Amino acid sequence: RNPATIADNVGDNVGDVAGMGADLYESYVGSILATFSLGACAGYGWEGMILPILLAVCGILCSIVGTFFVKTEENATQKSLLRSLRTGTYLAAALSAAAAAPLTWFVLGDWGVYAAILCGLVGGCAIGYFTEYYTSDTYKPTQKLAAAAETGSATVIIGGLSLGMMSTIASILIVAAAILISFYAAGGGASFDRGLYGIGIAGVGMLSTLGITLATDAYGPVADN
């Protein structure tokens, strides 16, 4: 009944569901179209152009399967809820990795491209893990920051700023490693265009399980309401 609470919940839905969904959808479609174009430039022909689209379809189906494994019990703790959501996300990624192998071989016959896809999937899961590590109250970084609040607001501001800066290091290193590995795995040493295609297909692989990832991100606003 509090208008401020209602406005806060509406803001959560607008920002964390509608806004984030539009942002991630734009990234998803952009990566598919970019890889579509790079497939033609790299000399793969229509096979290289259709692969990112098929990979996206495969990822959507695997995301749907992963949602069926997100199960909780009555009066479950927050830790068990997060574990259940994590299980569904990782399972969808594993299914996508397994399905991408025969798909890539049938369409292109190039295991290097599959290695780039796998690199993107692993990198996406790793970024998700480190994001949870630095933001969840079940891990030490946020627990230490909460303990710092006992000494005053200054320590919270300083500690929060430093923690936020440190939290980006892992993601930066993972993205850099994924770009480098996927570039050379797809044949970037011999052909620059094929290396760029490897980076693009790795991005599609990283975003292929966007369906369940976006559903997991929407858990917060839904739970608040």
Mark where each language-model region is.
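Hydrophobic packing and interface segments
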Residues: 1-225
